[in-house]
């Protein structure tokens, strides 16, 4: 969600800070700000409502000169989007930027008011600034003041604090919201995402839960939740500096849709050969864990949850292991029964999704045999805190609407299903070879699906004046319909819903009329005849049908029904394949609607607070 960048250097850092914010724009925000300690040890601050570009222009008009600074993009939680509520917030010589939610901010606000502090904003973050200023009255150490302040906070935070009286120091604290340190030569950096710092370093330390860090130009000191000095592993990033550039594409989402063949190759590389899935590639000790598994519990949010729903069909039909899938924000707040020898699987693009991370921590207390995460970001909290980590290697995904993260999660899940089925003796050698062959053909098949972009773009014109849409699917294509409806509503703002096609008679049929487009995913499989019956129900009521099917399904266009004839692919990987035309449809409808494709309103890429 919000973005943080900090720097301590010999050189002026304002440009580094603002460039970092530009790289974090994909996370979603409504205002931005930057503060620098100048050469006279004075705090200078500029904030603005709107885009980072406006902040950049303001700094160009009134340059900020200094080697220590912090910057922030805000996504409003407490207080409306405004310049006054934008970060950094200050108190005397202090400035602070903060991601997260301070749950006891009202209580602390009243306490600080009683001590004479005047609040200028509606935010919970201003409480932190005043609290640190108060604690600094009894110490000359910024680190100690921050330590005392955070002990009084309840909630989630990733924060960076600076004090103009200590001009070469930044102090950061992490509890429930990610922070990463970037290591330079004679300079060091902080950010909420390593992507912000790729132009200045490739060496990173990911702060762990409860860590507090003090950085100067030449030193980095980290203290754990008990106050003891801690050593944290240094990670060398292999992300490209231009990973957050659109290149020849109009939008990041479009770029990421077209990157999927390569992303899938990267996901599979070194994990499958011509005949089988390499079980050990899932992680050290994976085979021993899989041999004992009797149940799978998948926990995820949003698009990742939809990937888990597809995987449930695979786990049960291919591997013969029962599987439950639950939304993380529901899972963590209900009383549940842990099944014997149950493997917990978390899915998250960022590895920092707040509810999923909290669900993992809860599950550790509930007797799950092990926790495996399928994730795209190395060094993230889910990766560090899970027993096994299966990295999707999708590369940086900037568009808020997830595309390649979804398909690579599905590929990773299918490899896991195959490995589990093989270990459990439920998948034969011949079946494994069939799955491997189908997976290896996927990148080329997806290239064929991408070739339908012109046809789908023309189809999208039909949605120009539409305000509602209905998606239908059966079996493993029901969650693909759910994912398609999510994409359409996210980026085009069309109210879209998805149903298992067999549920039409149980309510949704009442919505069907000539103004309701109905998109059906209907490849030729064992459920096709059932889907055809559902299609006839829609036709009989004048609904406008858009059917995505292969030639073998036998559909012919007619009045009120358009057919998009896709190539035939293996049934096992067909859910991944049919995701592509759904993504293209959503993208082109959003273009026609004129919405902000990469940064849709009210949404953020990484949901790092509840």
UniProtKB/Swiss-Prot annotation:
Occurrences of domain SIS (ranges): 278-426, 459-600
Gene3D superfamilies for the chain: Glucose-6-phosphate isomerase like protein, domain 1, Glutamine Phosphoribosylpyrophosphate, subunit 1, domain 1
Record-linked Pfam families: GATase_6, SIS
Keywords noted in UniProt: Aminotransferase, Cytoplasm, Glutamine amidotransferase, Repeat, Transferase
Organism whose genome encodes this protein: Haemophilus influenzae (strain ATCC 51907 / DSM 11121 / KW20 / Rd)
Start and end residues of each Glutamine amidotransferase type-2 domain: 2-218
Protein's name in the database: Glutamine--fructose-6-phosphate aminotransferase [isomerizing]
Listed GO MF terms: carbohydrate derivative binding; glutamine-fructose-6-phosphate transaminase (isomerizing) activity
Quaternary assembly: Homodimer.
GO biological process: carbohydrate metabolic process; fructose 6-phosphate metabolic process; protein N-linked glycosylation; UDP-N-acetylglucosamine metabolic process
GO cellular component: cytosol
Catalyses which reaction(s): D-fructose 6-phosphate + L-glutamine = D-glucosamine 6-phosphate + L-glutamate
PROSITE patterns documented for this protein: GATASE_TYPE_2, SIS
Gene: glmS
E.C. code: 2.6.1.16
Major localisation: cytoplasm
Subcellular location: Cytoplasm
Keyword Cytoplasm carried by entry: yes
Record function comment: Catalyzes the first step in hexosamine metabolism, converting fructose-6P into glucosamine-6P using glutamine as a nitrogen source.
């Amino acid at each position: 969600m919000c973005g943080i960048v900090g720097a301590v250097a010999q050189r002026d850092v304002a440009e580094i800070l603002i460039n970092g914010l530009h790289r974090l724009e994909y996370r979603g925000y409504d205002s931005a700000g930057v503060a620098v300690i100048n050469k006279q040890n004075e705090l200078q601050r500029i904030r603005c409502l709107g885009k980072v570009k406006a902040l950049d222009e303001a700094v160009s008009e009134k340059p900020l000169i200094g080697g220590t600074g912090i910057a922030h993009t805000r996504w409003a939680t407490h207080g409306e989007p405004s310049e006054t509520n934008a970060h950094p917030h200050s108190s005397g010589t202090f400035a602070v930027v903060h991601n997260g939610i301070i749950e006891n901010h009202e209580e602390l606000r009243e306490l600080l008011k009683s001590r004479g502090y005047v609040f200028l904003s509606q935010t919970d973050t201003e409480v932190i600034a005043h609290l640190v200023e108060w604690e600094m009255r009894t110490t000359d150490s910024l680190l100690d003041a921050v330590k005392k302040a955070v002990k009084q906070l309840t909630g989630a935070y990733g924060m960076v604090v600076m004090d103009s009286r200590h001009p070469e120091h930044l102090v950061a604290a992490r509890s429930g919201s990610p922070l990463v340190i970037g290591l330079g030569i004679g300079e060091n950096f902080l950010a909420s995402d390593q992507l912000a710092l790729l132009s200045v370093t490739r060496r990173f330390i990911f702060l762990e839960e409860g860590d507090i860090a003090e950085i100067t130009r030449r030193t980095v000191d980290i203290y754990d939740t008990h106050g003891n000095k801690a050593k944290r592993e240094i990670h060398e990033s292999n992300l490209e500096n231009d990973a957050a550039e659109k290149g020849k594409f109009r939008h990041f989402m479009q770029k990421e849709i077209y990157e999927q063949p390569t992303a899938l190759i990267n996901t599979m590389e070194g994990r499958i050969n011509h005949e089988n899935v390499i079980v050990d590639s899932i992680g050290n000790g994976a085979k021993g864990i899989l041999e004992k598994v009797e149940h799978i519990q998948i926990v995820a949010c949003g698009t990742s949850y939809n990937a888990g729903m597809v995987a449930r069909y695979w786990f049960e039909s291919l591997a013969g292991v029962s599987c439950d899938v639950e939304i993380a924000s529901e899972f963590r707040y209900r009383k549940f029964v842990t099944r014997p020898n149950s493997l917990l699987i978390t899915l998250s693009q960022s590895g920092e999704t707040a509810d999923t991370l909290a669900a993992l921590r809860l599950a550790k207390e509930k007797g799950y045999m092990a926790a495996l995460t399928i994730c795209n970001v190395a060094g993230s909290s889910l990766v560090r805190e899970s027993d096994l980590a299966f990295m999707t290697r999708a590369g940086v995904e900037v568009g808020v609407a997830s595309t390649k993260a979804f398909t690579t999660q599905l590929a990773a899940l299918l490899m896991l299903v195959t490995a589990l089925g093989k270990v459990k003796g439920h998948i034969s050698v011949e079946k494994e070879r069939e799955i491997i062959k189908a997976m290896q053909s996927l990148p080329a098949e997806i290239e064929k699906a991408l070739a339908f972009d012109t046809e789908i773009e023309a189809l999208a014109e039909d949605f120009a004046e539409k305000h509602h849409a209905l998606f239908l699917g059966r079996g493993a294509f029901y969650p693909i319909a759910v994912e398609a409806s999510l994409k359409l509503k996210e980026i085009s703002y069309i109210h879209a819903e998805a149903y298992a096609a067999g549920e039409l008679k149980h309510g949704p049929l009442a919505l069907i009329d000539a103004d309701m487009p109905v998109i059906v995913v209907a490849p030729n499989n064992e459920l096709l005849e059932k889907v055809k019956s559902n299609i006839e129900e829609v036709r009989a009521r004048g609904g406008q049908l858009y059917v995505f099917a292969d030639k073998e399904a036998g559909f012919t266009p007619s009045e009120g029904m358009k057919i998009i004839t896709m190539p035939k692919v293996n049934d096992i990987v067909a859910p991944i394949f049919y995701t592509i035309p759904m993504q293209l449809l959503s993208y082109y409808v959003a273009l026609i609607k004129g919405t902000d494709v990469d940064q849709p309103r009210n949404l953020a890429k990484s949901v790092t607070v509840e």
